[in-house]
Each structure stands twice: as structure tokens, then as C-alpha cells.
Amino acid sequence: TKTRVANAKIALENQEILKEEQLVTIENTIKNTYELYQNTLFILEAQNQNVITSQNNFDRTQERFTLGQITSIEFRLAQINLLNSKTAVNNAKYDAKLIELELLQLTGEILNIAF
């Protein structure tokens, strides 16, 4: 019986160590996901600024096109640049939302439960 008690104590200690390891892993995962979320928000803001710049560039290009100072190819390039910057914003929003949902799931704010 002394052996059983000793084995039980060792098993309990092993379980406690595993529990602590899991808690550290979860905590690190949450911290990493939060940092990733902050980075995606920064990227989103940068992409929003890029849209403003692209819109200003397009507006100037449109004026110059109307005045006949640039070719239709240059005008089309400005259109494409504006479209690409708007697409990049949408992609950044999507990425930020995915990371936000992952963070909420990790912190228990949302659960994957079917009702």
C-alpha cells in the first residue's frame, strides 16, 4: 500500500505539472494572438491611409485626363491602383476579423457550441 500511495502522489504531481504546462501554453497562445490582432489593426489603418492617398492620386489623374494631359493608359493605371488599395483594405478587415474571432474564442468570449 505504501507503493500505491507513493505512485498516486507521483501521478498527482505529474497531473499538476501537466496542468501548469497547459495553462502556460494557453496564456502564451492568447498573448500571441492578441499581438497578432494588434498588428492586423495597424495594417488595417495603414491600408486605410493608402486608400486616401490612392483616392487623391486618382482625383488628380482624373483632372489631368479631362484636360488631356495624360493618356488613357495612365488614367487606367490610377483606377487600378485605387481599386487595389480598396481591395487591400477589405482583405485587412477580413484578416483582422478572423484574428478577433480567434482571440474571442481563446478567451472564452465565444464558444463553438451547436444549439
What is each model feature region?
Residues T1-D59:
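Sec/SRP-type N-terminal targeting helices
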Residues A6-A11, E45-A46, A78, A88, ...:
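A sequence-composition feature that detects small, non-aromatic residues
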Residues V24-E35, S85-E100:
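Short flexible/disordered coil segments
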